[in-house]
């Protein structure tokens, strides 16, 4: 889990799980077979994911307030837009992914790129993050940050965030913004 904690939020190019597995086992494996099986299982699991509690309500409230919404992800554009499309989340005015920048999280470049795209000063923006690397990127960009851990990151130190919630459904957008003011 310690290895994954360091990797989460950085993007797939930072860590090779196959090499980690070979190192732990002490012998080589059929790389293509392992990667093919892993990819198939990953796709099955992803297809079952639903929108997290509170996300739709928060997006709707943000739109009602006239707030601009963006996505900053260390994942590939194909992966991100595929999930946004599948989940019916089309309300983001800007989506930036690892394909769009030289440096991914914990570097602030993704967040700075989204803020520039939205014409929002980083100090006026709020990042919702589930990883320590994402929180570090948001804070380095000069943003306020809310940690909302997922099952993989719930046990990690996310204390660098300005606020931690178990779920986005815990607070209305108005309450969240008030706590960050």
Report residues per predicted region.
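Asp-based, Mg2+/Mn2+-dependent phosphohydrolase catalytic module
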Residues: 60-63, 67, 76-181
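N-terminal helical cap/lid subdomain that shapes the substrate entry/recognition surface
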Residues: 1-65, 78
């Amino acid at each position: 889990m310690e290895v994954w904690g360091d990797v989460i939020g950085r993007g797939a190019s930072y860590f090779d799980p196959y090499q980690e597995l070979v190192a732990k086992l002490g012998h080589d494996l059929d790389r293509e077979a392992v990667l093919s099986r892993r990819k198939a299982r990953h796709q099955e699991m992803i297809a079952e994911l639903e929108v997290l509690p509170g996300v739709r309500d928060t997006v709707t409230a943000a739109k009602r307030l006239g707030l601009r919404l963006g996505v900053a992800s260390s994942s590939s554009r194909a992966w991100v837009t595929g999930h946004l499309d599948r989940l019916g989340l089309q309300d983001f005015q800007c989506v930036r992914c690892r394909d769009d920048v030289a440096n991914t999280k914990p570097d602030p470049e993704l967040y700075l790129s989204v803020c520039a795209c939205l014409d929002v000063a980083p100090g006026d923006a709020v990042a919702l993050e589930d990883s320590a690397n994402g929180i570090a990127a948001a804070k380095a960009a000069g943003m306020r940050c809310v940690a909302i851990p997922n099952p993989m990151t719930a046990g990690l130190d996310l204390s660098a965030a300005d606020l931690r919630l178990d779920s986005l459904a815990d607070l209305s957008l108005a309450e969240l913004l008030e706590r960050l003011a």
